[in-house]
């Protein structure tokens, strides 16, 4: 009976069904399966699908464990949602070690330790694409971030990967990989003079662009640097007030797909401030900040400098996490702190990689497809 609905109405209804549920419906109807594979529908679904908090943690076995945080049931609660991995552990890839992950638009790019490949992966559909980098990816600081540019007429998104080794005010080499054309090329771009990433692992994606904390040596101030995948240029952005790197703790996150968020605290100050941007101007790149709320500082609030966090703007709740020991067992401690500083704590038992911290993403399971080449289909992908 549902199939007798007008196509436009049917698509509008299905766009509001979580991707994880749609995935289970693929085999029930050929028409729906074709629809779910349609790029236009996938994009429409991603834009309208309900968002959810998802924590991903690199485990000792190099899989990603996930924990869903529900802030909309009156009282914050958590649910273990299982293990995820782009690697088939029953294959000859069992020695593959995921070193870093970066999330953009429902997709992950995973850096593989001591390998020459990275992998772009959709956890919801299981689709993945292995990409040769031409370099052995050891722990020398090589990083890969994913972004996109959007066609103004068709609204189609084309994905790119930026490759770099840190970022500083000296000589630097950047490369870009276009997923559509399956090609690497050197990027002729000049870093912002006198600026360097305070930590290249503190990076987030918003509206297809990538953002990092950066320190200006001349002004001696902490700020942000963004990379625009349309112009392929870096931009300097400012924080809500002047911050010296030696005097402040700081963390960076996103609120939905619309705003940036930072936690700032003058060292030894009694309260931490949570700031978010107003909607940024896509043309001028200008943005303004407003303080959402403050929370008291205490040892029971796990919000140290650079640690991942998420913010619910409507409920004024900040969610943050930390590794710790509980009864001699490694656990992830998730704290949900409200504007009145009331805190709820969740313990997430998981065997983590020794040197890795939990990785927070404001994640929407999506049906977005990763463009493949004929050669890539034959890549050692098992």
Curated annotation (Swiss-Prot):
PROSITE patterns: FBOX. SUPFAM superfamilies: F-box domain (SSF81383), Galactose oxidase, central domain (SSF50965). This is Putative F-box protein At3g49980. The lineage of its organism: Eukaryota, Viridiplantae, Streptophyta, Embryophyta, Tracheophyta. Pfam families: F-box, FBA_1. Residues 1-49 form the F-box domain. CDD domains: F-box_AtFBW1-like.
């Amino acid at each position: 009976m549902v199939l007798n609905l007008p196509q436009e109405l049917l698509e509008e209804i299905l766009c509001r069904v979580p991707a994880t549920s749609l995935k289970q419906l693929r085999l029930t109807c050929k028409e729906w399966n074709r629809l779910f594979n349609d790029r236009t529908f996938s994009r429409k679904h991603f834009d309208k699908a309900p968002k959810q908090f998802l924590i991903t943690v690199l485990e000792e076995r190099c899989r990603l464990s996930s924990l869903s945080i529900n802030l909309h049931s009156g009282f914050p609660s958590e649910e273990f949602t299982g293990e995820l991995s782009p690697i088939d552990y029953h294959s000859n890839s069992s020695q593959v070690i995921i070193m870093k992950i970066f999330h953009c638009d429902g997709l992950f790019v995973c850096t593989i330790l001591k390998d020459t490949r990275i992998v772009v992966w959709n956890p919801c559909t299981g689709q993945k694409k292995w990409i040769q980098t031409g370099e052995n990816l050891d722990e020398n600081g090589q990083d890969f971030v994913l972004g996109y540019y959007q066609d103004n007429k068709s609204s189609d998104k084309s994905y790119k990967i930026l490759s770099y080794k840190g970022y500083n005010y000296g000589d630097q080499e950047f490369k870009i990989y276009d997923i559509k054309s399956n090609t690497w090329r050197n990027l002729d771009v000049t870093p912002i003079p006198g600026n360097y990433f305070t930590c290249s692992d503190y990076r987030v994606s918003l509206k297809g662009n990538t953002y990092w904390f950066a320190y200006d040596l001349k002004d001696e101030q902490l700020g942000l640097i963004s990379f625009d995948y349309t112009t392929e240029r870096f931009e300097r952005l400012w924080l809500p007030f002047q911050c010296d790197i030696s005097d402040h703790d700081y963390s960076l996150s996103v609120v939905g797909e619309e705003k940036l968020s930072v936690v700032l605290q003058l060292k030894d100050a009694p309260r931490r401030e949570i700031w978010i941007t107003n909607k940024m101007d896509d043309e001028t790149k200008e943005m303004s900040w407003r303080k959402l709320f403050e929370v008291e500082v205490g040892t029971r609030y796990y919000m140290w400098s650079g640690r991942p966090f998420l913010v619910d703007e409507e409920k004024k709740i900040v969610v943050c996490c930390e590794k710790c020991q509980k009864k001699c067992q490694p656990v992830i401690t998730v704290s949900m702190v409200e504007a009145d500083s009331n805190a709820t704590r969740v313990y997430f038992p998981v065997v983590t990689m020794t040197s890795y911290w939990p990785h927070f993403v404001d994640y929407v399971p999506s049906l977005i497809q990763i463009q493949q080449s004929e050669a890539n289909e034959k890549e050692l992908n098992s």
